[in-house]
Amino acid sequence: IDVSASFSPDAKKIVFNSDRNGRRHLYIAEADGKNVRRISREGGSYYTPVWSPRGDYIAFVKNIRPDFYIGVMDTNGDNERIVVKDFSLESPAWSPNGRYLIFYRQQRSNSDGTGGETTIHFIDITGYNERIIPTPRDGSDPAWSPLL
């Protein structure tokens, strides 16, 4: 199944994840669906790819049990690097200037079996300067507003 499509800023290409080879990997295709090629090369399963606003990177979630990672790579799959690692990380979204990622982190379940707290964070794409975005309650699925 092909899921989680994200258009390039010029709308000429899409990146998506697919289990077409057994494990979830990232693929790029022309906007019309032609010329599909796999770009992820490392181990683990890849999810939720998002094209950067400048079109130079793709952010993604990666799972190598038991941990989740948020990383970035060049649009051809080269130079994959991990930005942050934890128990559960989801929903990376680019800042309008392409220098930061916002995402949410879920803590491990509480001892009574209830889900752990979820918090929204942002971090620069080098993996430094991580900060929590204060929210009145748990937060998930963050998004940036566009530059005006």
Question: What is the predicted function of each stretch?
Answer:
Residues I1-L148:
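Sequence signature of WD/YWTD-type beta-propeller architectures
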